[in-house]
Amino acid sequence: MAYKERFRKVVTLERLCNDYMESLSYEKLSPATRRDYATWMGNCIATVGAKTKVITIDTPTAQQHYNLWAEQRGIPTANHIRSVMSRVFNFSIQVGSCFHNPFALIAKLSHRSRKETWTKEQVKQFLEVAFKEFKWRSVGMIVYMAYTWGQRLGDMRELKWENYSFDDRVLKLEQSKRRARVELPTTDSLHDLLVKQHEDMGFQPYIAPKIAYGKIKEEPYDKVMLGTIGRDIREAAGLPDTLQLMDMRRTAITEMVDAGVSLPQIMAVSGHENPQSVKPYMKNTLTSSSEACRLRLEAGGGDIL
């Protein structure tokens, strides 16, 4: 017992995070989630200090750091760090590394969920600029695939040729976030681009490999570089800075809603198993409300005079 007490007094934040990353709980997460968790833990360590003794981190200290993250990096990032670190401390309590979770009781700020979508013209402007420059071509492919197939940027970044059947013109994908499997047809224009991309870059495994200094690398873009290049293309296209690449999935789903596509059919594309999970991607638009009113009128409701 005395040894355990001494151990708890000297264990550092870095040690706590490393122990969690070696755990079965962490190993069972999807690769994408593990990468995200590692990023948020790294952010916390960089701020609090790798060698900081865990016993010195109390709730007021955690609250101060949370407030700083919210101010400097934004509320969504602060909430991600808080959530992951709370998991780390809960795991450490379970294995006896510490007695407390300083992140469990801090006041969490709420943030407005993004509802922004791109117009078809804005998507077209972005792609036209991206495909004019060889250095931006793969980013253009990633964005076009995300828009056409309604998938997450992370999955499109790491998409391999083995995922696409040129004969059937079908994408077969196991999503990294929830392991959902989807099979999606493609459009003629995207298929033609994929054929051209394979002719030029099929010697390596990725559909949209990283292009650096005019050379094709046999690796995908990372999340940060994709965002940086995406902003460069957006600026070159003269598009508003409120638009983000991650909004492509929401844009695709919103277009399906506007077109009157049923929820089960949307879920077959998005890979969601729960209808509630689709709601954050859905947006109230004049097109969808007009269609709802039209259907109501056709059914004999609404217009009574």
Give the positions of each predicted feature.
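C-terminal secondary-structure termini that scaffold catalytic or DNA-interacting sites
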Residues: 213-216, 295-305
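Short, basic (Lys/Arg/His-rich) helix/loop patches that form interaction surfaces
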Residues: 128-136, 149, 184, 200-203, ...
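DNA breakage-rejoining catalytic core of tyrosine-based enzymes
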Residues: 55, 97-100, 110-128, 178-188, ...
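Short, polar N-cap/turn motifs at the start of nucleic acid-interacting alpha helices
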Residues: 163-170, 240-241, 261-282
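Catalytic-site neighborhood detector that most strongly recognizes the C-terminal catalytic loop/helix
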Residues: 117, 175-179, 270-295
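C-terminal catalytic core of Y-nucleophile DNA break-rejoin enzymes
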Residues: 176-196, 204-232
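Basic, Lys/Arg- and aromatic-enriched nucleic-acid-binding interface segment
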Residues: 79, 94, 98, 104-153, ...
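N-terminal core-binding DNA-recognition domain of tyrosine recombinases/integrases
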Residues: 1-7, 18-32, 39-114, 128-132
